[in-house]
């Protein structure tokens, strides 16, 4: 089963680094708690084209369980603008932190094997 990436974007102005870090660290505990619900990773976005997050889930089902219409309504209320959600299946991942390549979440090659 492929992992799922959801890109969430808000049409909002770029924040200062200080505000972006403050916002991210204040909500990080919520997302750390989602590890048991399939969230592998969340990266917070801050740029000229808006703000948001990139979520890597263990499956589309896990992502859909989190990103319900109720959740989108909650985010809309919090940020004052409705987010755009873009969904992707990801079949192949190169993870340089772990030194491996994964297919559908399963390691198929370690960095030492690739270098040989």
Language-model regions: role of each:
Residues 1-50, 60-68, 79-116:
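Short S/T/G/P-rich N-terminal loop/turn motif that feeds into the first structured element of a domain
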Residues 53-57:
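Conserved RNP beta-strands of RNA recognition motif
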Residues 73-79:
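Short arginine-rich
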